Amino acid sequence: LNKVWGMAGLAAMLLSGTALASEVERVPHGVIVTPDQGAAKRVRVLAYGDAAFRVTAVPASDLNLPRSLMVTADAAGDPVIAETRGLVTLKLAKATAEIRLSDGRVQFRDAAGKLVLDEARRRFTATSADGKPFLATEQQFNRGTDEGLYGLGQHQNRQMNYNGEDVELAQHNMDIAIPFLVSTRNYGLLWDNNSITRFGNPAPYAHVGQGLKVSSGGKPGWKAEYFLGEKLAVTRQEPFIDYQFIKDQANWPEAAKAQTVASPQSGQNTAGVVVGKQSVVWSGSVTPDKTGTHKFRLYSSSYVKVFADGTEVLSRWRQNWNPWFHNFELPMTAGKQVELRIEWEPNAGYLALYHSDPLAQPDRHSVWLSSDVGRAIDYYYVGGRNMDEVIAGYRGLTGKAEMMPNWAYGFWQSRQRYETQEQLLSVVREYRKRDIPIDNIVQDWFYWPEDQWGCHCFDAKRFPDPVGMVNEAHALNTRVMISVWPKFYPNTANAKELMAKGHLYLGNLKAREKDWVGKGYENTDYDPYAPEARAIYFRQMKEALVDKGFDAWWMDATEPDIHSNLSIEQRIDRMGPTAQGPAALFFNSFPLVHAEGVADGLRTALPDKRPFILTRSGFGGVQRTSSALWSGDITARWDDLRDQISAGVNLSMSGVPNWTHDIGGFALEDRYTNQEPAHVAEWRELNLRWFQFGAFSPLFRSHGETPKREIFEIAAGDKAMYESMVAYDKLRYRLMPYIYTIAADTWHKDGTMMRGLVMDFPRDRKTWNIDDAYLFGPAFLVAPVTGFGARTRDVYLPDGAGWYDFATGVLYKGGQTVKAAAPREAMPLFVRAGSIVPTGAAISHVGEQPDGPIVLHVFTGASGSFSLYEDDGVSPKYQQGKFARVPVKWDEGSGALTIGAREGGYDGMAKKRAVSVRFYTPGRAVVPDFAESAQSFVYDGSAITVRRP
């Protein structure tokens, strides 16, 4: 029996709640199925528009869940519902969901009817949090898939295509958890769970020595040798390697302990350094039970190397107050030993080694999500014709990406930290004196008196006139961003107000934990999950800072990082319970609700200004909070530079278009901090290469610990480096019409600025795994150089387009790898044939010459178009239609460039503008100063056609 219900025939049933069949109940916008068997007792599927569904599965009968923190949309749309051959089908205009009556499994088809997402195993496991019952949840899809998978936030292990990878989503200084995936099959999957979540293998990795057997000298366990200097202090057998957290340091052998002393703020380890050299060597034979690719995760800080059968497989350094995971894989055969050796210079650091056995190939290559704490399996399917449409659909669920003010896309100068207002202002004055473009200066932490963290006040000796400081910066056409934390010392008036209302977390205070400042001070964070707490927090911030005229808000440590190097269990204890429930249930969502409170406050307090927030962490929906994200306290290492490419691209593909990184890396090895002569050349080259990458990132921001990062400081005495940095800065400003347009498109077209090659070239499978290049808007292919001394690099040019070398004008056919020239002062950069790239005048800040001339660079070889965007740059009036577009279209066949009639307008818009057109043909290099012009005219808003000479 086939049953099909149209909307007219459903009206009475909707009113009466009549079941459509014994196993199926029609509800507004969808159905609830009670399967015959399986883990889920009830499965609800609801439509969210014309291409999205929500699936909720529970092992009991209750489907009433709290309102999602991530999703702001409501169920909408009326699918055509049919029951046939044991399936209930919900058909929308652009997507179809099918539910099996036998076990409640759901599968999804695209607009053409092609199966793209198919549930496999589903599991619920009883668990608890704060003594209350909850569920650990697990859902697998698409076993044995060959699709490309992207998104999931920002991760630091050079993972681009997640197919076959394992990723833990748990907020951390450098790791951002956003449980949203986008697939080459043109669907997205939003996993609506706020707790710690895993993609891939749901089983946590085990210490090497627990699951994977290890032996040495005929005995179980590792041979561990502890050295003080060159002297062997302790040799012992250890079952596994685990110095991951502060609590684990108690296991350090007494005879191998070294004296520690405090280190300078800018040194390798602000928690202290050891006196003399300290090292540990672990060696052992590991014997696997399974044949296949074994995965390892080394959690480490300081210098560490890993060798397998004598071959180095990993070499990393990371600052000790911010250790993190480093992944590697080894092909291993069951029963065949592999000799592992780990060499570590701990310097009072942290280290642990974990392992995961190979999964069956259909499981390794699947979409598999699991969460520690929840109430149900709850996820959203989002369909589309391409990845851009999928990301747009995700934003339709979780909120549009707010436009940033135009000055946010200029250059940002920062350092850790300006100690006085005179230091900050002197930097701005020097940039202006040298005519180096800049728009933003940043006041990092510790502008307050030492014992007053959370007062949002200024140390009067160092910052005697913060209002005057802001005013002078403004007079120099520069905005000021200031650091504001969710952290409080309990003695401050702000903390006392929050405490009186019950809005401070108590765990850190009960533990009497002290921070690293001065003698150390007890501290904690506020609880943003209560609306009243968010209102108090913003009012305190407004009265102390917003009213002084600061322009942008650096929301640091928003994971929250209440105390570094605590275990997950300790972190949960310190960050809860929240006003909405156990901390374990809300582990990943703090940065979202915190940013929402600040953004809402800013919109109310300053209704004529677009807010700008820079936050270290984010969650699903953070793009709606006027927030840009950055990649945390990464290190000044070539491998970290390389890691930022895939980190930024995947965050962008998670629906967050505004992203940045600390140019040069935040934390430094002592060889750089001390400017050791043997390493100065590498330090400078690293910063220059990173600066080149930064100029083609969504936000262009220099920041880090000593040495000073200002262009005129870091390049002092190196004329070629200085000139290259200034040239890239000026190029960024020349490109501002292009950059601001692609930035505006993130709102108006739900676009993405920093694009994985796979987004534009999904049919070219070679693009799927490229983790060292990306597209910056539709025109530019950016290929950062990430190795010291490299003067060429291989660049894959995607099939389906021609590519101009930006430096030489040589036109390459796509679908090939070219060896691009990469002198120290230049980064390989390519432009897609058919691109139209608008550039502007030579300016020193974005507000200069709002009516300045435009050059339209037309890269011939294919037809193309560009919609040049303008608005007032600072207000939210763009949301009311106050903006202008100039459509530009290039027809390769006729050789005609059509500049269309201006569409729209806004207050202060230039009515006329000088426009030049330059056509590029193979072999013609892009003119760096943009002075040369083929044809020039005055554009008054009327359409005009220009023909190629």
Task: For the regions a language model picked out, list residue spans one by one.
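Catalytic and substrate-binding clefts that recognize carbohydrates or anionic sugar/phosphate headgroups
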Residues: 35, 83-219, 308, 315, ...
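Catalytic core of carbohydrate-active enzymes
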Residues: 599-612, 618-630, 643, 651-661, ...
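Extracellular/secretory pathway-exposed regions associated with glycan biology
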Residues: 205-295, 299-375
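A low-complexity, Ser/Thr/Gly/Pro-enriched, surface-exposed linker/loop concept
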Residues: 23-24, 28, 46-90, 127-129
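Aromatic- and carboxylate-enriched substrate-binding clefts and catalytic-loop regions
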Residues: 60, 326-328, 350, 437-725, ...
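Bacterial N-terminal signal peptides
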Residues: 8-17
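Short, well-ordered beta-strand segments enriched in hydrophobic/aromatic residues
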Residues: 33, 43-45, 55, 89-90, ...
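Solvent-exposed beta-strand/loop surfaces of large extracellular or lumenal domains
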Residues: 63-81, 268-270, 308-328, 507, ...
